[in-house]
A protein has these predicted regions:
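N-terminal core-binding DNA-recognition domain of tyrosine recombinases/integrases
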Residues: 29-136
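Basic, Lys/Arg- and aromatic-enriched nucleic-acid-binding interface segment
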Residues: 143-175
Length: 344
């Protein structure tokens, strides 16, 4: 990652508890009050907003003498956005951090109008996000690239990472959904069904579909409940999951994807950041271009429609979209609710 002046940028690390404790109490309390009232947000969204606001107020502590949030001015917030740009953040990342602060300000305007009647949101619509030129192309991985990635991970005996890649790609799920997978799924029975597909020569043929369904998983949606679904995956995924658990051995953690202490004495559910690190630091190196957890979802939809010649509606069912128009945006050229044609 490079700065606008050409130097290598430091990564914006998460704010530690010690750093957050140094932020003035007024700002910390306002952030907590705001977040506690956002009942429409999912746990993942709340985590993202909390992280963005903590980064901002640590910057305020370091650069604006730890002043109260209601005293911050527009020109000072512009300095913050320039700081983010100079740290090498993408325009999308800066835009989210801008919207997080703006949402907090709107909360203060609406809920504390009697306490602070002169306060106005200093993050305005006309305030442009700095043009960093750092906009990542949404290029799905081809079937050959997916095969290469899986082959290399198998050669390296990275069984957990291989299981993650196969599960995430096969289901087309988001990284917050992969996180919830329980290891009990390896004991589930397969669903077998004869389906009719259209091959690359536009001829119909009947083939057997073999797939599995997970336990209930909370997917993207408003509120803490969100949209609850059972994700569907193929036999190759089941084989990879079983291989990972065989290597992992017995432990008390119910989750499929985990982190262990060096001595292996403690095992716990893995965090979001690990999936990002795997993709950016290792999978990107294997594939030869930038890869993210969400790119597996986009790649699955594209390859299903463009390479496997399945109907757009099949990809729609697999990804859990309410409208095929949403699925179409993923496809880059980009039970009746099941996507059985995806598993033949």
């Amino acid at each position: 990652m490079r700065l606008l002046n050409g130097k290598i940028a430091d990564k914006l690390d998460p704010v530690t508890d010690e750093e957050w404790a140094e932020v003035n109490e007024f700002n910390r309390n306002m952030v907590e009050d705001y977040l506690s009232n956002q009942t429409h947000l999912s746990p993942h969204s709340l985590h993202a907003y909390r992280s963005a606001l903590k980064i901002f107020f640590v910057w305020v502590k370091n650069n604006l003498n730890n002043k109260n949030c209601i005293e911050i001015r527009k020109k000072e917030f512009l300095r913050y956005m320039n700081f983010l740009a100079n740290r090498g953040l993408s325009e999308a990342a800066i835009k989210f951090k801008k919207s997080s602060v703006s949402a907090l300000n709107k909360f203060i305007e609406n809920f504390y109008d009697e306490d602070y009647p002169t306060f106005r949101n200093y993050v305005t619509a006309e305030m442009q996000v700095p043009k960093t030129g750092k906009v990542f192309a949404k290029e799905p991985l081809t079937p050959d690239e997916m095969d290469h990635l899986c082959s290399v991970l198998a050669e390296r005996e990275e069984w957990q990472k291989l299981a993650y890649v196969k599960f995430t790609y096969s289901t087309g799920c988001r990284h917050a959904e992969s996180l919830q997978l329980l290891k009990e799924v390896v004991n589930y029975e397969p669903k077998r069904k004869i389906v009719t597909i259209v091959d690359e020569d536009s001829k119909e043929q009947e083939v057997e579909s073999v797939s599995y369904k997970t336990h209930e998983i909370r997917c993207k949606g408003r509120s803490a409940v969100g949209q609850v679904r059972k994700l569907q995956f193929g036999q190759d995924v089941m084989d990879a999951l079983k291989k990972w658990l065989e290597v992992r051995g017995d432990d008390d953690c119910p989750y499929m994807f985990v982190v262990k202490t060096k001595d292996g004495s403690k095992v716990r559910q893995i965090g979001y950041s690990a999936f990002n690190d795997w993709c950016i630091n290792e999978f990107s190196e294997i594939v030869g271009r930038r890869t993210t957890p969400h790119n597996f979802r986009r790649s699955r939809a594209t390859n299903l429609v463009c390479y496997d010649h399945r109907a757009l509606e099949t990809a729609q069912k697999l990804l859990g979209h309410e409208s095929s128009e949403t699925t179409q945006m993923y496809v880059i050229r980009e039970d009746t609710e099941d996507a059985d044609e995806a598993f033949v």
